[in-house]
Amino acid sequence: MSQRVVVFLDYQNVYHRARDAFCSPPASASQGQVDPLALGRLLAGRVPGGCLTGVRVYRGRPSQRRDSRSHAACRRQTARQVGRGGGLVVVLSRELRYPPDWPRRPAEEKGIDVALAVDFVMMIARCECDKGILFSSDTDLVPALEAVLALRPGDPAACEVAAWAAPGVRPHSLSVRGARIRRHLLSEADYRSVADLTDYTRTE
């Protein structure tokens, strides 16, 4: 029996964890980037009977007024991800919040984790997918897993998690105490198979 799988990507978290796990300094900014569709297919392929029905990418968006170069790069990357996605990839972005002393302090995402958590819970609770795979190491998202377990109890759980797994390093995967949630631990070979090394700052 096929299972509809939707993958939820906390994109900046996925990116930075990939860099930490698999990219030796000095690494270019493109190292750590992933192709959402390729990653979604990889994960859905590890669910018994899994059929990928969506990849939802949540990320911050640089301000055009404050950082036009990064804003343009983000737009190019988003367009390519959606264009490659065959109708399966959706990118949801919110403008970054800039501190008064930017760029000495970096801009930060605002509201991305909340948007991801709400969509994750609602889509699974409404049975819009059979399996929702959450790829993030942000512990602020643990309550979303807890909510899914309460709203759609069962074994196996309707929610699963994913994380990068570097040799000899404990993976930063999310968990809920006392609950059995399947973990997809992705190796460096997995990362290389879905990596996107495009330099989106280039206009050519």
Which role does the model predict for each range below?
Residues M1-A107:
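Domain-level signal for Mg2+-assisted phosphodiester chemistry and nucleotide/NA-binding surfaces
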Residues L88-E204:
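Nuclease catalytic cores that cleave nucleic-acid phosphodiester bonds
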